[in-house]
């Protein structure tokens, strides 16, 4: 399982990084000087907060990050003998 988990974790990290770039690109179409930090706080920018495409892409990123956290937790539990 560690090799499988490692491969999955690597793939998921690549997906997260790609989606972060995509979210930032969409954000910069609305707010040209948006930073990676800004996209973590879209409520500070009405243009981002109300844009459906931004929210869609941000939701996908949130899902990937949630899955990444769950996978890490599962791997940690398995390595500590917790089921």
Q: What do these predicted regions represent?
A:
Residues 25-43:
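Short recognition patches in nucleic-acid-associated and regulatory proteins
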Residues 2, 77-83:
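Short acidic DE-rich linear segments
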Residues 37-76:
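Short, charge-rich amphipathic interface segments used for partner binding and complex assembly
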Residues 1-28:
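Short, charge/polar-rich alpha-helical segments
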Residues 26-27, 75, 79:
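Enrichment for repetitive, rod-forming helical segments
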